[in-house]
Structure formats: C-alpha cells, structure tokens
Amino acid sequence: MPYTPLGFGVIALPTGDPKVAVVTLFAIDANGKANRSGFDTVFEGNTTYNIEGRLRTDFGGLTGHQLAGGVYSTKTFSSLDQNLRFIIENGAIEQKDHSWAFYYNFDQYLYEPKKGSGQGVGIYGRFGASDGNPNPIHYFYSIGIGGKGILPDRPLDQFGMGYYYMDISNPKFTGPQGTRSFLRDEQGFEAYYNCAVTPWMKLTPDIQFVRPAQKQVIDSSGSVPIIVKDSISTATVLGLRLQLIF
C-alpha cells in the first residue's frame, strides 16, 4: 500500500556507503487522506516528524548494527482514557495534544566464520517507548537469536527464536458504574527452522505462543455491551510454510 499523505524527506550518507551509515529525516502531513489530493492540509500544523540513524559496527571483529530513531507528531488525537461526565459536559470525547515515540534496535553476530557471507549466529534486540497516551503501546521489548549455515553440510538452513513484551497503556472508561479497563500487557514467543530442501525449495516449521492484550470477549451487537468471555488464555499457533523460488 503506498503512502497517501504528502511528505518531505532527506537521506544522508555520512560515509558515502549506505551499508555503513544512514541518517534519515522525514516530515509528513498528518491530515493526509487517500481520497483527497492537493496541498490544502500541508501547512495546517498537524505534522509528523521522524528522524532515524543506522550504523554498522565491528565489535570484536564481528558485524553488527545499531539503529535509533524518534517520532513526534503535533496532531491532536483522541485520549485513551474517557470520562462520561466530560463527554456530556463538552459534547465531545477528551483529546490529547501531540504524541511522541522513541525506538532502538540492534543486531550483533556472535559467530561469523566469514565476513559478508550472511552465515553465522547472532542476537538482536529492540526497545521502544512512547507517551502512553494517545499511543496505546507505552513500552516494547524484544530479544532473540538467529543463525544461518551453522551446520557444515546445511549452508542454506536458517533458524531463529525470539520473545517480545508490550507494556500496554490500558484504556479506561469512567461512567456511572465506575472505571473499567479493557486491555492488559501482551507477550509472545516464536521459533522456526527454515530447511533448504533444495536451493529453490525451503520448508519452515514454526511455533508461536501469544498472550494477547485483549483480556475479555465483549459482544457489542446490542444496545449494552456484554462480556461473553471473562478471560482469554494464551494461544498456541503451529505453522508450516513451503517456499518455491523461481
């Protein structure tokens, strides 16, 4: 899907090589819509800015990368927390001005038999933080390990496993029956092994465990929402993928 809002971006290559270091800066019209063209909303002040930098590292003679970025928006958003009294008195839901987020990623080989070959074993990690309102994901953490070609007679095989945790800003609604919250923190784990049956055929078994952020099943079809299931347990998903390369 293409980007629909208008924007402007700058890409800088401090060393001249995009594989070594890249810095990007973007400004995007936060009011852009897919069914509207022109520059009517570009200068209204609702703008989202993004700056990001990526650097290749060589700690201990092993390839790695460090990436950090930030996002800031001047747009007004709907607040995650709502109060019925505020809605009645103002005739509108509560709003939040501006939003921000920060993120950091890294990947690092722990074993790299030949530089640039793409083979070896490495770890990766991610961290993200936001204002927590209006952004529902307050903090995000993930860590994992992966590798390719670690068996001498299986140079094309790959494997990976990772864990993530999302600290959710639980939306709250305050009404006549008190304050209710609707979500919880989410976490999950995934592991896979990509087996190269031939150079052009790859078979990948996969397993995932996910405890979702949604903690209740609510039926909203009637005039009054009804909780039809009070607890949602962890889901286990088994998968098998076949890839044919032409």
Q: What do the predicted segments below correspond to?
A:
Residues 8-12, 51-57, 104-108, 143-147, ...:
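Residues on the lipid-exposed face of transmembrane beta-strands in outer-membrane beta-barrel proteins
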Residues 23-29, 66-72, 121-129, 143, ...:
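Transmembrane beta-barrel strands of outer-membrane/channel proteins
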Residues 15-21, 56-65, 111-121, 149-158, ...:
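Short loop/turn motifs that connect adjacent beta-strands in outer-membrane beta-barrel proteins
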Residues 1-53:
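Aromatic- and glycine-enriched pocket-lining scaffold segments that form the walls
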Residues 41-43, 96-97, 129-140:
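Solvent-exposed loop/turn segments connecting transmembrane beta-strands
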Residues 230-246:
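Outer-membrane beta-barrel "beta-signal"
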Residues 34-40, 77-85, 134-139, 171-177, ...:
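Outer-membrane beta-barrel translocator domains and adjoining extracellular loop/strand segments
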Residues 30-105:
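Surface-exposed beta-loop-beta
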